[in-house]
Amino acid sequence: METSPSEMRLVQRYVALGDSFTAGAPGTPSEGRWPDYLAEALRAANPELEYHNLGQAGVTTAEVAGAQLAPCLGLDPDLVTVVCGANDVLLSVRPDIEAHATSLDYIFGKLRERLPDVALMTATTPQLSNHLDLRPRSRRRVEEGVIRLNEATREVALRHEVVCLEFADHPGARERENFGADGFHPSTTGIRRAAGAGVAALRQHFGIRTTQEVA
């Protein structure tokens, strides 16, 4: 049975951690990122919402842990999204998925330890090789790396009871319209659809009050 709107919880402080999927690709307007749409849906229910996007383009999961986690903890949020790992694959000729898993485990562990009541959400990574212009050897490396990355993300999320949005297995992951000109970063359509999935998950898994849909 779905929780009635009057019984749903309000988010007071939302912090978004991650790479360019959170921070926005270079040139992306600061109000056009998927956490921005998520915050907009939350603010419709609670106009007093505080929203902090700490994401940075080009960072690995270890760099998220090293540079973004401490400021996040200092803000004492009741909702945190952590979406990262793509750069662990794209920026290395030998993707170190164990390093990603170790860093993600550390992030989730610290958040659970310091903020036991926080709502935590992460996501898998769409198959980046689908739309990137890559040579065969690089395509295999990226394809295999993303598969292993997502396996690790799911495993760590499950261990820490973190809701994991399935962007990797979503039919939209193969639709070109959901990606920008570079074939890597999401398009405006893709961003809005990702935010819509996030809003639905907040309502379903946490009983968090939002607008019904992303505007």
For the regions a language model picked out, list residue spans one by one:
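Ser/Thr-centric signal marking residues that sit
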Residues: 22, 60-61, 81, 124
